[in-house]
């Protein structure tokens, strides 16, 4: 459970702003915003989702900074409520919607701060997923870097040895590697994994649309990755009930439960959310499925700025997709400076004041 995960971390005083009030868009406004989100997804060629703890609360796993989050309750001297274990938690509608979006080629990559393993257990392909803070179900060989996805949580945290050894054969006829296996869960001062950080950075730079789901974007460097999309000329959509650190940079802000938003999005895209039929691990993405016919999206009479509430509703409308009325060039594909940062940044504290 996230409670046990949080308790297993080293003491750390500055966990960011916790317990901020939640904001809910009125139903009609939410519908219009999700229509616009569907339009952006259809218009984009490289969509990246950034996910946080808010996408797993519907499975019974509490978040950290929400009104009843683990750290919010801790600040109040109260015990957080939890309804399940990591092993018993089921992927949410949001997890399964992401699986289907990837299958039909509308989603290029997912960058996740979550350690609950639900992306992998939902069947989302691991080669299109960066788990920046680790996975409670994964252990890695310290010698050959082979990863093992287990059916139960590994049992240790902080990149510690688990007591098991690597069974990968070095070569035909030779004995197994027998390197020590370690968990993949980061503590506060641990450096982010080279491979996952490099993939997340490259995906964020090359995206023409980044969508954040259920994250306050307070933890660095994970929370700053969506800004790489903006710097390259792409769009940023933030879906969260609480204010986030990067709200002022968003082209569209949606305040609603992520499951409700994703359910409406899939409807507007003409896609079904697949049922979850038990844990399954998919190492590599399959060839994309054909997309269904695109349903006609109802036009919205509001610009992105009006939907965000930054322009009066009776002002002259601007083009929905581009602030200056002209379409910018597609973001230039950019490779990271190196395959993996030589000294990856540490998982550092949250910045104190969200914007």
UniProtKB/Swiss-Prot annotation:
Its EC number is 2.3.1.-, 2.3.1.286, 2.4.2.-. It comes from the Eukaryota. One of its GO terms (molecular function) is TORC2 complex binding. InterPro entries: DHS-like_NAD/FAD-binding_dom (IPR029035), NAD-dep_sirtuin_deacylases (IPR050134), Sirtuin (IPR003000), Ssirtuin_cat_dom (IPR026590). Residues 287-296 have a biased composition (Pro residues). Keywords: Acetylation, Acyltransferase, Chromatin regulator, Chromosome, Developmental protein, DNA damage, DNA repair, DNA-binding, Endoplasmic reticulum, Glycosyltransferase, Hydrolase, Isopeptide bond, Metal-binding, NAD, Nucleotidyltransferase, Nucleus, Phosphoprotein, RNA-binding, Telomere, Transferase, Tumor suppressor, Ubl conjugation, Zinc. There is a cross-link at residue 170 (Glycyl lysine isopeptide (Lys-Gly) (interchain with G-Cter in ubiquitin)). Acetylated at Lys-33. Deacetylation at Lys-33 by SIRT1 promotes homomultimerization and binding to double-strand breaks (DSBs) sites. Phosphorylation at Ser-10 by MAPK8/JNK1 in response to oxidative stress stimulates the mono-ADP-ribosyltransferase activity on PARP1, leading to PARP1 recruitment to double-strand breaks (DSBs). It catalyses: N(6)-acetyl-L-lysyl-[protein] + NAD(+) + H2O = 2''-O-acetyl-ADP-D-ribose + nicotinamide + L-lysyl-[protein]; N(6)-tetradecanoyl-L-lysyl-[protein] + NAD(+) + H2O = 2''-O-tetradecanoyl-ADP-D-ribose + nicotinamide + L-lysyl-[protein]; N(6)-hexadecanoyl-L-lysyl-[protein] + NAD(+) + H2O = 2''-O-hexadecanoyl-ADP-D-ribose + nicotinamide + L-lysyl-[protein]; L-lysyl-[protein] + NAD(+) = N(6)-(ADP-D-ribosyl)-L-lysyl-[protein] + nicotinamide + H(+). PROSITE patterns: SIRTUIN. The modification Phosphothreonine is found at residue 294. The active site is at residue 133. NAD(+) binds at residues 53, 57, 64-65, 71, 113, 133, 214, 216, 240, 242, 258. The modification N6-acetyllysine is found at residue 33. GO terms for biological process: cardiac muscle cell differentiation; circadian regulation of gene expression; determination of adult lifespan; double-strand break repair; ketone biosynthetic process; negative regulation of gluconeogenesis; negative regulation of glycolytic process; negative regulation of protein import into nucleus. The modification N-acetylserine is found at residue 2. The modification Phosphoserine is found at residues 10, 303, 330. Its main location: nucleus. Residues 284-355 are annotated as: Disordered. Compared to other rodents, beaver SIRT6 displays higher histone deacetylase activity and ability to promote double-strand break (DSB) repair, possibly leading to longer life span. Homodimer; binds to nucleosomes and DNA ends as a homodimer. Interacts with RELA; interferes with RELA binding to target DNA. Interacts with SMARCA5; promoting recruitment of SMARCA5/SNF2H to double-strand breaks (DSBs) sites. Interacts with the mTORC2 complex; preventing the ability of SIRT6 to deacetylate FOXO1. Interacts with the CLOCK-BMAL1 complex; recruited by the CLOCK-BMAL1 complex to regulate expression of clock-controlled genes. Interacts with CSNK2A2; preventing CSNK2A2 localization to the nucleus. The C-terminal disordered region mediates non-specific DNA-binding. NAD-dependent protein deacetylase, deacylase and mono-ADP-ribosyltransferase that plays an essential role in DNA damage repair, telomere maintenance, metabolic homeostasis, inflammation, tumorigenesis and aging. Displays protein-lysine deacetylase or defatty-acylase (demyristoylase and depalmitoylase) activity, depending on the context. Acts as a key histone deacetylase by catalyzing deacetylation of histone H3 at 'Lys-9', 'Lys-18' and 'Lys-56' (H3K9ac, H3K18ac and H3K56ac, respectively), suppressing target gene expression of several transcription factors, including NF-kappa-B. This is NAD-dependent protein deacylase sirtuin-6. It comes from Castor canadensis (American beaver). The lineage of its organism: Eukaryota, Metazoa, Chordata, Craniata, Vertebrata.
């Amino acid at each position: 459970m996230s409670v046990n995960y949080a308790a297993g971390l080293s003491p750390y005083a500055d966990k960011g702003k916790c317990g901020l009030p939640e904001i809910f868009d009125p139903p009609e406004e939410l519908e219009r915003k999700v229509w616009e989100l569907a339009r952006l997804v259809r218009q984009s060629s490289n969509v990246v989702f950034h996910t946080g703890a808010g996408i797993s609360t519907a499975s019974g796993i509490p978040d950290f900074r929400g009104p009843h989050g683990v750290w919010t309750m801790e600040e109040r001297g109260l015990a957080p409520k939890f309804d399940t274990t990591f092993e018993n938690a089921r992927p949410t509608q949001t997890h399964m919607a992401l699986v289907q979006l990837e299958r039909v080629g509308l989603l290029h990559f997912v960058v996740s701060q979550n350690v609950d393993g639900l992306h992998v257990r939902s069947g989302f392909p691991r080669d299109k997923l960066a788990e920046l803070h680790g996975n409670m179900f994964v252990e890695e060989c310290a010698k050959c870097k082979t990863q093992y996805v287990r059916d139960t949580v590994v049992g240790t945290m902080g990149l510690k040895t688990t007591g098991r050894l690597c069974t990968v054969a070095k070569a035909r006829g030779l004995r197994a590697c027998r390197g020590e296996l370690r968990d993949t869960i980061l503590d506060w001062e641990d450096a982010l994994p080279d491979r996952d950080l490099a993939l997340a950075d490259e995906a964020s730079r090359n995206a023409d649309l980044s969508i954040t789901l259920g994250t306050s974007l307070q933890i660095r460097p994970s929370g700053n990755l969506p800004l790489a999309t903006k710097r390259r000329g792409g769009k940023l959509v933030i879906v969260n009930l609480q204010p986030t650190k990067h709200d002022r940079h968003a082209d569209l802000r949606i305040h609603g439960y992520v499951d409700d938003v994703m359910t409406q999005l899939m409807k507007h895209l003409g896609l079904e959310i697949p049922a979850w039929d038990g844990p399954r691990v998919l190492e590599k993405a399959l060839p994309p499925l054909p997309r269904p016919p695109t349903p006609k999206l109802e036009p919205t009479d509001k610009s992105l700025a009006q939907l965000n509430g930054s322009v009066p509703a009776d002002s002259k409308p601007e083009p929905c997709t581009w602030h200056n009325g002209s379409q910018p060039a597609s973001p230039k594909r950019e490779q990271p400076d190196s395959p993996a940062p030589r000294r990856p940044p540490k998982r550092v504290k949250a910045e104190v004041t969200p914007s």
